[in-house]
Amino acid sequence: MKKILLIGTGGTIASKEMGDGLTPELAAKEIVSYVPEVQNLCAIEVLQLCNIDSTNMHPKIWTELAKAVQKNFDRYDGFVVLHGTDTMAYTSAALSYMIQHSRKPIVVTGSQQPIDREGTDARVNLRDSILYAMDEYSENVVLVFDGNVIAGTRAKKMQARSFNAFQSVNFPVLARVQDGRIIRYLPYIPEREPVRFYTEISDSVCVFKLIPGTRPELLSYLFANYDCVGMESFGVGGIPDALLDTVYQAMQKWKEAGKFLVMATQVMNEGSNMEIYRVGQKVKKDFQLIEAYDMTLEAVVTKLMVLLKRYGSSYEELQKAFYAEVNHDILCAFPEQ
């Protein structure tokens, strides 16, 4: 019988109405008791890591999660992480970079309604996640929700309240869990490299979303206080003329100091390509800017957090590692440009 470790972190799935709003109260051991049928499918053991609203998720907890999987990796056949939906995409992306080449599945799931509520989606999501974690062809970090199995680096929350809360961005859904069966859409290619854990990460990463009329002094502040800024630009990517002087003044100092600017787009689908327009092409070539292409923002942020800790001040090494595909995170990068 397969052994699955259920790791509780809180979220809506663990919440109860406390008079001043839903609050995580149920432990993972209590949650699994709502789906007693899974006890006949596998041996489930429980680890309660924390019990928080996922709005309060923090990189320190990602480190604790990754270390918990590392410590128990040889003891279990799969792992299921119970999590709130609001930051679930960040956590599934972070774990994808912190636990690479895992032949064992690490499934992140939760629900839009508490598990003790009538008509909740929690029981189905938990059952589907355990079924997927038991399967011999499952591996690496995935997010399972509303029957969809999404690569951990490609998930994004698209609905605030509906059960079909998550979509896979710029990459196909890996599989569906339906009526107790797993329907896979991609051919199975087993991991051949040994599992690697990168449990230490940097939180010196900031996202800066451009709006028409953005003030240059905001960039100066971010450049002074963070080691990496992910800039969400417009369309396929570019920097407004009003910001160019600030960017040019800062970039050389940044590279010398081992700091980084990564360009992304506010447009969710199809990704960036700074080579198309003048507002993007020149600054990218002048400074060999790192570009996010078709990655999700959650993947960009968490990948940078992991890489900053691994490569420190080496711009070339970090750029090379950023463009290296991890768990289907980037498909259209052209690092030679």
Give the positions of each predicted feature.
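Short, acidic/small-residue loops that bind anionic groups at enzyme active sites
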Residues: 92-123, 130-136, 254-265
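ATP/NTP phosphate-donor binding region
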Residues: 1-71, 269
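Short Gly/Thr/Asp-enriched flexible loops that form oxyanion-binding sites at enzyme active sites
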Residues: 81-104, 241-249, 280
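Short acidic, glycine/serine/threonine-rich loops at helix termini
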Residues: 16-20, 92-93, 118-121, 151-157, ...
